[in-house]
A protein has these predicted regions:
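Conserved core of the sugar-phosphate nucleotidyltransferase
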Residues: 97, 125-218
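Short active-site oxyanion
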Residues: 56-61, 146, 221-223
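N-terminal glycine-rich phosphate-binding loop and ensuing alpha1 helix
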Residues: 16-63
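Short phosphate-binding loop-to-helix
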Residues: 67-116, 127, 133-137
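Short, high-confidence coil segments that cap the C-terminus of an alpha-helix
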Residues: 57, 112-114, 142-145
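Catalytic donor-sugar/metal-binding loop of nucleotide-sugar-dependent glycosyltransferases
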Residues: 203-224, 229-233, 237-246
């Protein structure tokens, strides 16, 4: 179990950092997914290990409504001092109130205020601990930034359907077609892979801010977000490929 740092003085280097990993028991697309074994450990354990290995988190907290997930997370090194209330573990529960609840309960138990929150989604396992460390370091060294997260580069064209059924191309200031290398890339926000934000954003019910910094990646595997059996199969295949090619 991660233990809190004994003492903190003022200054950016002494900022208290807590990683929060939300993992509820209910899953319609892939029942029991957070406990399914993947690469030799339960799915939930991957994110716990990444947070610990980043070396920047004073606490690694898993918020769950499920005793089995709680036990698996604890075995991986997480802090799991409470079970999440049922009303915050429904199919349509947004992430923001879950993070706020976890932060407030952790602070009440620890008797401290955390300055930076690291948010990790357990269904996103293709991350590097270094990305977490970079996100936290950005907030510690750049006070003008309120959040830092991973974003995947893409050169694809995006469209949105309007209320009247018509279609509008997003970002029509870009050249519509042409060689991929000549087009300005877009970056898809992937906060669940790795993100760090000022705790006041969480207290305000937000998980991104207005003054962001992005960790740019171009990583196909990190786009795998495990929600159903096919996603899980892709993750298994990607892990095997990485194991053979590293």
């Amino acid at each position: 179990m991660t233990e809190p740092t004994a003492s903190h003085n003022s200054g950016p280097d002494k900022a208290r950092v807590i990683a929060i990993i939300p993992a509820r028991g209910g899953s319609k697309g892939l029942p029991g997914k957070n406990l399914k074994m993947l690469g030799g450990m339960p799915l939930i354990a991957h994110s716990v290990v990444h947070a610990i290995e980043s070396g920047v988190c004073d606490r690694v907290l898993v918020t769950t409504d499920n005793e089995e997930i709680r036990a698996a997370a604890e075995a991986a090194g997480a802090w799991t001092p409470f079970l999440r209330e049922a009303e915050l573990a429904q199919d349509l529960t947004p992430t923001e109130p879950v993070l706020k609840d976890a932060l407030e309960r952790a602070e009440a138990l620890d008797g401290v205020s955390y300055d930076i929150v690291v948010f990790l989604q357990p269904t996103d396992i293709f991350r590097e601990p270094e990305w977490i460390a970079r996100a936290v370091d950005t907030l510690k060294t750049r006070p003008e930034i309120d959040c830092c997260f991973v974003a995947n580069k893409t050169h694809k064209n995006f469209w949105v359907q309007e209320d009247d059924g018509s279609w509008t191309r997003v970002f029509d200031w870009m050249a519509i077609y042409g060689p991929r290398q000549t087009r300005k890339p877009l970056f898809r926000e992937d906060t669940g892979i790795a993100s760090a934000l000022r705790s006041e954003l969480i207290r305000a019910g937000r998980r991104t801010g207005d003054k962001a910094e992005i960790i740019q990646i171009d990583n196909t595997a990190s786009g795998i977000d495990i929600h159903d059996a096919f996603d899980f199969h892709l993750a298994e295949t990607a892990l095997e490929w990485r194991k053979r090619n590293r």
